[in-house]
Amino acid sequence: MFKKLFGKGKEVQKDIAIYAPLTGEYVKIEDIPDPVFAQKMMGEGFGINPTEGEVVSPIAGRVDNVFPTKHAIGLKADNGLELLVHIGLDTVQLDGEGFEVLVSSGDEVNVGDPLVRFNLEFINNNAKSVISPIIITNTDQAASINIYDENAVIKGETKVIDVTMN
C-alpha cells in the first residue's frame, strides 16, 4: 500500500542486465590479480582488461558515488542493485592523475553513457594493472546472478551479467 501511495505506482523491475562498461578482454573474477576482488570479498562480478580509455555506464540508474581519486564509481539501479566500477588495480595511489570524471554523484545514467575517461598508457605504466573489476557490492541481496563467459566485450553493448534482485 505504501509503495502505491509514495512510489507513484511505479513497479520496480527486479531483473537487470549488466553490460560491459569498457571495451576489452573479459576476465573472470577469480583471475583478477588482486585477492580482494578475486576472492569475492567485495562481491560477485568480473573484470575487463581494457583496450581503450573510456568507461560507460553498465546499467540504467544513478551515480551513487564518485571516488575523490577518480579511479572508481559507484552506481545504483532502481531495483537496489549496487555496482562498483573500479578502473585498474592500486589506482587509488595515482590520486586522480590520468582520470577525467564526466559525471557527478546523483546524476541519472543510462547504459552506454560516458562516466570516466582515462589515460590507458599512463595507468599501464603507473599502476599494478589496468584490469578493471566490475563488482556487485550488494551480492547478498541478489536472488540470482548469471554471468556470461565472454571473450571480447564492447562497452555499452556486450551483456555480461543478468541479475534478479530480492
From Swiss-Prot:
Zn(2+) binds at H71, H86. This is PTS system glucose-specific EIIA component. The phosphoenolpyruvate-dependent sugar phosphotransferase system (sugar PTS), a major carbohydrate active transport system, catalyzes the phosphorylation of incoming sugar substrates concomitantly with their translocation across the cell membrane. The enzyme II complex composed of PtsG and Crr is involved in glucose transport. One of its GO terms (cellular component) is cytoplasm. Its cofactor is Zn(2+). GO terms for molecular function: kinase activity; metal ion binding. GO terms for biological process: phosphoenolpyruvate-dependent sugar phosphotransferase system. Gene3D superfamilies: Glucose Permease (Domain IIA). It is found in: Cytoplasm. Residues 34-138 form the PTS EIIA type-1 domain. The EIIA domain is phosphorylated by phospho-HPr on a histidyl residue. Then, it transfers the phosphoryl group to the EIIB domain. Keywords: Cytoplasm, Kinase, Metal-binding, Phosphoprotein, Phosphotransferase system, Sugar transport, Transferase, Transport, Zinc. The modification Phosphohistidine is found at H86. PANTHER family: PTS SYSTEM GLUCOSE-SPECIFIC EIIA COMPONENT. The record marks H71 as: Important for phospho-donor activity. The active site is at H86 (tele-phosphohistidine intermediate). InterPro entries: Dup_hybrid_motif, PTS_EIIA_1_perm, PTS_EIIA_component. Heterodimer with glycerol kinase (glpk). It comes from Staphylococcus aureus (strain Mu50 / ATCC 700699). Binds 1 zinc ion per glycerol kinase EIIA-Glc dimer. The zinc ion is important for dimerization.
